Amino acid sequence: MEFHVRPGGALRGRLRVPGDKSISHRAIMLGALAEGETRISGFLEGADALATLRTFRAMGVDIDGPHQGRVTVQGVGLHGLRAPDGPLDLGNSGTSMRLLCGLLAGQSFDTTLTGDASLSRRPMRRVIDPLTAMGAVIESGQGGTAPLTVRGGQPLHGIDYELPVASAQVKSALLLAGLYARGRTCVTEPAPTRDHTERMLAGFGYPVRQEGRRVCIEGGGRLRGGEIDVPADISSAAFFLVGASIAEGSDITLEHVGMNPTRTGVVDILRLMGADIQVQNEREVGGEPVADLRVRSAPLKGVAIPEALVPLAIDEFPVLFVAAACAEGETLLTGAEELRVKESDRIAVMAEGLTTLGVTAEPQPDGMRIVGQPDWGGGRVHSHGDHRIAMAFTMAATRAREPIEIEDCANVNTSFPGFVELAGDAGVALTRGDAEGRAQQRSDSP
């Protein structure tokens, strides 16, 4: 599938983007391991979160839904999962694979985890090694990639682990394994990362001890089911934050956005660049801060992005590169080598696409240097099957002089089902077409 985007167009209106992907994954996982019923609203019905849902159904968990974002999970307790009939296919979801490695390490049965071609290239050694230190046995493909087989029946013991690279997925995998481990499991981060696992464990009644950048749990506790309201995903909102910032005449409000302080780096970086973002109607829902974000177009300036903000915006850099491309002056990103091992090499792929559009974008080993300009041409860019790349270049068209065609966009549904329709409602002139360029569906501004 391809996206064809006509240039220009202000973004206007009130929008609610789909539910948070990170929270949706964890709601299913913890709800399945809890005792009693868990009722979820706002669940993200994207391919990644649905892969997690199917996985727990395959392990004997009764799950009703999703029905318009509502899911009911009948928990089986920490030791109630059953062996699946065959390998568990996680599609494109790295979150599912890494977190399940920790969770499945404490089960009594063997499980094989597989994924698509992109996921099968992503590094898993970073989670396999510390889990092995806890007593887990995990077999991988050459180079520590999927498919992975997690051997059951292994006695786990707690460890005190210092993450060499900030990673919420690795931290979460170790904490989930720690539920089954003898003694205490502690993880120390070099920099703050998203803390949904810690917050949600506590919300399910499991004691969690936080000491600065060190988080600890004791094995042998219990989880209690309850209610979870999943806020809108700030990573999905980011495309509209940037689109409205760079498209002249824009004024949009994004509703019920999750504002977890470990996720708001994109707002902080855009404000450093001069973006006009107002945080309104702040409140707390289910232990997570939530707000409405009003965004109006504003002239942006290039900045040196503080490395302390990198882990807090790691998924948003593709669209932040688009913001940098139309900012006055130079933007420099360093300390973001993690971008090279996402669904694609996001540094190389974004530099390639921006260069195609006529932007000066110089990839660095751990980041990028971008020289902004008032507008740019169009052209044909390749997303390499990366959902965030495809959506980032969609927003780039709001400042282009000519149409932009984006190849290989089917994976947008992994995180943002309904993106084409919502972007059209906001004012983006976006057409979805097949590989031969034939239009299939049009979502134009009025």
Swiss-Prot record:
List GO molecular-function terms, semicolon-separated.
Answer: 3-phosphoshikimate 1-carboxyvinyltransferase activity
Catalyses which reaction(s): 3-phosphoshikimate + phosphoenolpyruvate = 5-O-(1-carboxyvinyl)-3-phosphoshikimate + phosphate
**UniProtKB keywords:** Amino-acid biosynthesis, Aromatic amino acid biosynthesis, Cytoplasm, Transferase
Q: Please name the PROSITE patterns in this protein's record.
A: EPSP_SYNTHASE_1, EPSP_SYNTHASE_2
Which InterPro entries would you find in this protein's record? Enolpyruvate_Tfrase_dom, Enolpyruvate_Tfrase_sf, EPSP_synthase, EPSP_synthase_CS, RNA3'P_cycl/enolpyr_Trfase_a/b
Q: Where in the cell is it found?
A: Cytoplasm
- Which Gene3D superfamilies does the UniProt entry name for this protein? Enolpyruvate transferase domain
SUPFAM superfamilies referenced in this protein's UniProt entry, alphabetically: EPT/RTPC-like
* Residues forming coiled coils: none
The Gene Ontology CC terms held by the record are: cytoplasm
The record ties this protein, via Pfam families, to: EPSP_synthase (PF00275)
Instruction: Name the CDD domains on file.
Output: EPSP_synthase
Active site per UniProt? 315
**E.C. number:** 2.5.1.19
Residues bound to 3-phosphoshikimate are 21-22, 26, 167, 169, 315, 342
Q: Which GO terms describe its biological process?
A: amino acid biosynthetic process; aromatic amino acid family biosynthetic process; chorismate biosynthetic process
> According to its UniProt record, in which pathway does this protein act?
Metabolic intermediate biosynthesis; chorismate biosynthesis; chorismate from D-erythrose 4-phosphate and phosphoenolpyruvate: step 6/7
Assembly, in brief, is: Monomer.
Q: Which PANTHER family match?
A: AROM/DEHYDROQUINATE SYNTHASE, PENTAFUNCTIONAL AROM POLYPEPTIDE
The record's family statement is:
Belongs to the EPSP synthase family.
Q: What is the purpose of this protein?
A: Catalyzes the transfer of the enolpyruvyl moiety of phosphoenolpyruvate (PEP) to the 5-hydroxyl of shikimate-3-phosphate (S3P) to produce enolpyruvyl shikimate-3-phosphate and inorganic phosphate.
Q: What protein name does the entry list?
A: 3-phosphoshikimate 1-carboxyvinyltransferase
List the source organism: Alkalilimnicola ehrlichii (strain ATCC BAA-1101 / DSM 17681 / MLHE-1)
